Swiss-Prot record:
Component of a ubiquitin-protein ligase complex consisting of the cullin CUL3, the linker protein ELC1, the substrate receptor ELA1, and the RING protein HRT1. There is a cross-link at K688 (Glycyl lysine isopeptide (Lys-Gly) (interchain with G-Cter in NEDD8)). This is Cullin-3. Pfam families: Cullin, Cullin_Nedd8. Gene3D superfamilies: Cullin Repeats, Cullin, Chain C, Domain 2, Winged helix-like DNA-binding domain superfamily/Winged helix DNA-binding domain. Present with 172 molecules/cell in log phase SD medium. GO terms for molecular function: ubiquitin protein ligase binding; ubiquitin-protein transferase activity. One of its GO terms (biological process) is response to UV. Keywords: Isopeptide bond, Ubl conjugation, Ubl conjugation pathway. The gene is CUL3.
């Protein structure tokens, strides 16, 4: 019976018979080896054997003993090999035989090595020979393992695949494999272990081939394929960990990843990802994402997520058309904001790890949405900028409703600012937003507190450059409100039946021409002229160095009037209101007479009077014809379901061709001047830093600074440079005019 009890051998006190011949001594050693191999060591005197080996080595016979032992072990191993090969009738039985043989031989080698320890110390080490135990292992490798390698590898691979087919880990089999793998890892040649050089490559190749055939994606749905692959990977991982070392286990993981994920799932990753997002299944999407930790795979999943969101964005129609453009803008923007909101909420539940996206690390969900929507907006041109501004305008006006849900409106606005920051045409958004904000503020169509909050939100995503004038507009409204309160309590504002609410605006910050040519000669009713003169006097006392210039085309007048059907409050543009007030003193007037009394151009008079006499909802004038001359008078039979009636406000009321050209030119010139001033400030900052630059260098740096804000044209740049030269901020180089110097 083989025992694991350690054998203790003491150094002999006497050498015994010195004349003992080597052959006789060898017979003693051989006898001991035979009994070790037959597991019959009960009557064996280990002390006597050790003395014999000690004497042989001491008498310089170590090389002979070493070689004789090696030859004898080869004979024994060869005999064992023939028995194994002869009995090799079944794979699993063969594996069991090999495992038992290995364990028995290791035990025999260990005892033999212990007996030869003196030879190891005195002969093997000085002569750089393998110690006896190592020599025994090497002989086993040569005589057993190498000569049975093909049968062993084939049997082991077959048994592994048999267990894979069963789909259940069998501990009896895996324990056997672990012994054999341990044997292969123990036995080395000059290169590496048998496991690494001979078995592992075959195992990897066989595993790859097995899993290539294990699943047919075409016969399964994407979800079924994912579930099948998940089970295969889970089982293989459990199986491999039961008999392989960590390095080999990881190599097989890579094989499965290449075969099952890149080879099988690669064509349906997008379909899988889209399906998970359609049903908003975060757990499923996380499983898809975690199938591989390789960055290339994870970026592929992220690109699939992007394609799904982009497809949904594209499916939201713009419905371009002038008839319902405002409603189209609100509908489109609402759906886009909801898409962004829902996808942001969904993606925040996914753990994306530390994947790099567009060379950036951080919040992957925000990066995904940023990439998708910025790319989408860039392809659609100016419409997203226009529509989102209109959507914000719609939300702001809702804040004035009686049952307004302010919290929900603010959330809608907050979500819209995230999209505003992704717009390509930010300058277009700024222009439209500024115009819409001006209307809301002047017509009091929104809550100023919400307007201020929204400008701060926009400032966070676009920067101060885009919001500086918006902040000035809001400041103007706040200061005007304070001024109105003070003016109300002054003795100047004491005209009966007349309430005046002034808005003092900074001319360069509001998005319209500051004056209208009509305003120069218009003749206002006496009470209006008196109140305006009173405010001018009040303002000049408060701000002595400032000059007021009235912009009637931006103003609104409300007049209360008693008709036969009741009392109505009618809202006009100042021009229309001036005309209507004439009928306090006149029963009827012709167009010419109205012109003479107001000095409003005749074409504009005609347009304003026609709007008050033909539009059904505000038909407050009636017309009559006598002797071919059209006359107008108050229509006392006017009625409306609403007490408040609004005559369409015309900011610039259909002026004559001449005045129209002047107004348009003024508007364009004002905008260009604003751009020149902004650009000049940027150039000054650049030149102050650089000191000296060529024209081309200045152009490149200025373009880089302004590319996200405005479209830089050569004419605007030229005007800005010329302005700075005139104001002595910069000067041209005297020797080379293409260079500029900063003047401190």
């Amino acid at each position: 019976m083989i025992t694991n009890k350690k054998i203790k051998i003491s150094v002999p006190e006497k050498l015994g018979l010195s004349e003992e011949s080597f052959e006789e001594s060898w017979e003693t050693v051989k006898y001991a080896i035979d009994h070790i191999y037959s597991d019959d060591m009960a009557d064996l005197s280990f002390e006597q054997v050790y003395k014999t080996i000690y004497t042989i080595v001491l008498n310089k016979k170590g090389p002979i003993l070493y070689n004789r032992l090696k030859d004898y072990l080869i004979q024994k191993l060869a005999l064992l090999r023939e028995t194994i090969v002869k009995d090799n009738t079944h794979d699993y039985e063969f594996l069991g035989t090999m495992a038992r043989l290995w364990e028995v031989q290791c035990h025999c080698f260990k005892i033999t090595g212990d007996l030869m320890m003196y030879m190891d110390k005195v002969y093997c080490k000085p002569n750089r020979c393998m110690e006896v135990y190592d020599m025994c292992l090497d002989l086993f490798r040569i005589e057993i393992l190498q000569k049975c390698s093909s049968s062993l590898i084939s049997a082991l691979i077959s048994d592994i695949e048999r267990i894979r087919n069963l789909g259940s880990v069998d501990s009896e089999h895996t324990s056997l494999w672990k012994v054999l793998i341990g044997m292969m890892e123990t036995l080395h040649d000059n290169r590496d272990s048998f496991f690494l050089t001979d078995f592992e490559p075959v195992l990897i190749s066989a595993t790859e081939e097995y899993y290539n055939k294990a699943i047919d994606i075409e016969l399964l749905t994407p979800i079924e394929s994912l579930e099948k692959i998940r089970k295969l990977r889970q089982f293989e991982s459990m199986l491999d960990s039961s008999f392989l070392n960590v390095d080999s286990h990881n190599k097989l993981k890579t094989v499965l990843e290449n075969v099952l994920i890149w080879g099988k799932l690669s064509d349906i990753i997008e379909d899988l990802t889209h399906e998970a997002m359609v049903i908003s299944n975060g757990k499923l999407l996380q499983e898809i994402y975690d199938l591989s930790s390789e960055e290339k795979y994870r970026v592929t999943v992220i690109e699939s997520i992007k394609s799904y969101i982009n497809k949904n964005a594209i499916n939201i129609p713009f419905n371009e058309g002038n008839r319902k453009k405002g409603q189209n803008a609100i509908t489109w923007s609402s759906e886009i904001v909801e898409l962004y909101r829902s996808q942001h909420s969904f993606l925040e539940s996914i753990d994306f790890g530390s994947v790099r996206l567009n060379n950036l690390t951080g919040d992957v969900s925000n990066a995904i949405l940023g990439d998708v929507f910025s790319m989408y907006f860039s392809k659609e041109g100016a419409l997203p900028s226009e529509y989102l501004s209109t959507y914000v305008d719609h939300c702001m006006k809702r804040t004035k409703e009686k049952d307004a849900e302010i919290v929900k409106i603010k959330q809608d606005l907050l979500d819209s600012t995230k999209l505003i920051g992704l717009l390509t045409e930010k300058d277009i958004f700024e222009k439209i937003y500024k115009k819409q904000l001006s209307r809301r503020l002047l017509q009091q169509r929104s809550l100023v507190e919400i307007e201020k909050w929204m400008v701060q939100m926009i400032k966070k995503v676009l920067g101060t450059f885009f919001t500086s004038k918006l902040e000035i507009m809001l400041r103007d409204i706040s200061l005007s409100s304070e001024m109105y309160q003070a003016f109300q309590h002054s003795t100047i504002n004491s005209i009966e039946y007349l309430s005046f609410a002034p808005q003092v605006l900074t001319r360069t910050s509001w998005p319209f021409q500051s004056t209208n040519p009509i305003d120069e000669g218009i003749s206002l009713p006496p009470r209006m002229s008196q109140i305006l003169a009173g405010f001018e006097g009040y303002y000049s006392l408060k701000y002595k160095e400032r000059v007021l210039k009235w912009a009637h085309h931006l103003s609104v007048i409300e007049i209360g009037c008693q008709f036969n059907s009741g009392y109505y409050e009618i809202s006009f543009s100042v021009y229309a209101g001036v005309i209507f007030l004439l009928f306090e003193d006149y029963e009827e007037l012709t167009l010419g007479e109205i012109y003479e009394l107001t000095h409003i151009p005749i074409d504009d008079v005609k347009s304003l009077v026609m709007s008050m006499s033909t539009i059904p909802r505000c038909k407050i004038l009636k017309k009559s014809s006598s002797s071919g001359n059209m006359k107008f008078s108050v229509n006392y039979f006017f009625s409306s379901p609403n007490r408040k009636v609004k005559v369409p406000v015309i900011a610039c009321p259909l002026p004559s061709q001449k005045s129209d050209n002047l107004a348009t030119a003024s508007s364009v010139d004002t905008y260009d001047n604003e751009i020149v001033m902004e650009l000049s400030a940027i150039i000054v900052r650049i030149m102050k830093t650089e000191g000296k630059l060529s024209h081309q260098q200045l152009l490149e740096r200025t373009t880089k600074r302004t590319q996200s804000r405005l479209s830089l044209t050569p004419s605007i740049l030229k005007r800005s440079i010329q302005l700075l030269i005139e104001k002595e901020y910069i000067q041209r180089n005297a020797d080379d005019p293409s260079y500029y110097h900063y003047l401190s």
